[in-house]
Regions:
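Alpha-helix-loop-beta-strand connector modules within alpha/beta enzyme cores
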Residues: 2-26, 76-83, 87
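Hydrophobic faces of well-ordered beta-strands that scaffold small-molecule active sites
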Residues: 22-28, 41, 48-50, 98
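Active-site-proximal loop/turn and secondary-structure-junction residues that shape catalytic pockets
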Residues: 28-32, 54
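Catalytic cores of alpha/beta
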Residues: 31-44
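Flexible, glycine-rich loop/tail regions that form catalytic "lids" or insertion modules at the edges
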Residues: 36-37, 47-50, 62-190
């Protein structure tokens, strides 16, 4: 939702011809990885405060889960994020954040044309998909998982499987079944 809001505000100011008069400061629990930050900057964010990451790092430092002081650990995290953003910018030949901000150099995958036209004006998309309704359903699902009923407190958090296959996690094309089929085909020389 933060990327939708950022881009929508960015384009609203552009339509009013007032974009250069305002900064868009993001304070959100969503951004965690360089890609998240890159998208937010690419769609108009001027600055980003990933408060939840900072709170988690501070908590882990105070509980001795990590060895650095909170300040040092947050500084290390910020350096890693900056390095990741610079890497993204370098791959497309942009050398300053000023040039990257609002450049919208991404292609959208899996979002409906209607959603793109409303929130991500002029962003190319060749593979259409979900709209605002499906995004709302996903947000509500995640919210209800995050704020579980008291009777379920103490149960472990779900692993998720965003990046690799997990039982009962996000669906992936590469999963144990496809790997087994591939291995069988290779063994049988098919």
């Amino acid at each position: 939702p933060m990327l939708l809001a950022t881009s929508h505000i960015h384009h609203a100011f552009k339509r009013l011809k007032k974009r250069s008069q305002f900064g868009i400061i993001i304070e959100s629990a969503e951004p965690r990885e360089p890609h998240h930050f890159s998208l937010l900057f690419g769609y108009g964010a001027s600055a980003i405060n990933p408060y939840l990451v900072n709170e988690i790092i501070t908590y882990q430092s105070k509980k001795a889960i990590i060895t650095e002081s909170p300040e040092k650990a947050i500084s290390n995290y910020n350096k890693a994020i900056a390095k990741g953003i610079i890497k993204v910018m370098n791959k497309i030949g942009i050398s300053t954040l000023h040039s990257y901000r609002g450049a919208q150099i991404n292609e959208a995958l899996g979002l409906s044309k209607k959603l793109i036209d409303k929130f991500f004006c002029n962003t190319p998309t060749r593979i259409e998909g979900i709209g605002l309704y499906e995004i709302e359903k996903e947000i509500n699902k995640r919210h209800s998982k995050a704020y579980i009923h008291e009777s379920k407190l103490g149960l472990p958090l779900e692993i998720g499987g965003d990046y690799r296959w997990r039982r009962d996690g996000e669906a992936h094309v590469v999963n144990p079944s496809t790997i087994a089929t591939l291995q069988q085909a290779v063994r049988q020389n098919k």
